[in-house]
Amino acid sequence: MIEELEKRIIQNIQKIPPVPLSLFLSGGIDSSLVLALVRKTYPQTPISTYTLAKSKDYPDMIYAREVAKLFKTDHHEIVIADGDFRYFQNKYDKIKKYNFKGDINIYILCFYAKKFSNIVLTGDGGDECFGGYWLHEYPLGHKETGRIRSIEEIHPAPRKHIEEMVRMGFRNFLFKEKSDTEDYNAVWEYFIQCLAPKHLEPLLHTAELLDIQIFTPLFSESFLSFIRTLPYMERIGRKIEKQLALKYLPESVVQRESIGFDVALEPAGDSIGYL
């Protein structure tokens, strides 16, 4: 399965022309794995990587720096001051179509990445494909305390997603005593069909405005078709993704806890830097 997974990702990468490339690098498993396989596919292609954060010692900056050095990219660390953040926010407010958290971060990265190449790669889709969200693994309906009385008893943080799932007909799954395999497959499809487009739409919209081509090697119809053939327990918790990533990446990168790109500038840093 590991070999087939790698083959499928590389097939997506091979659709990208071997010209100078830009890549959004958070130092997490998704973007780092994409970088590793892009470098394997195109060993001589110039690659410029971009990391956005609120300070130079932000975890994403530290891990991305390590990965960029490993794969010999032209790496850029972008730290945004409050005043510069407002500048970008004002520009983005005039053109934005969506209002999702972290959209401005995408706009800033695209702004800088285009300076090197109008072809940009991202690790988007990894959480959805490889079961990176808590709900993929959380033992819903297997509560030792018995019947669940409220949404907060399931999990307090993602209430908005739980409420949306209830509206979509997942109430029985969330509150019943035992969950079936079909239920978990339905949750996986929920993230693919509903959340993934919400994550990608702001990126694609910004890319269109800035005349950038976006490639997501971890998210395509053919790739999803392959992932659906895997046993559910292999799909969730990033199990198969981590096994592949360990072939190319340090364990510290593969096993690190995800912070979330949408909070990379909360709060903004003290100065703007572009190296």
Regions found by a protein language model. Give the residues of each.
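Substrate-binding beta-hairpin/strand module that engages nucleic acids
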Residues: 256-262
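Active-site- or binding-pocket-proximal scaffold segments within functional domains
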Residues: 269-275
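ATP-dependent adenylate-handling active sites, centered on carboxylate activation for C-N bond formation
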Residues: 1-188, 194-252, 263-269
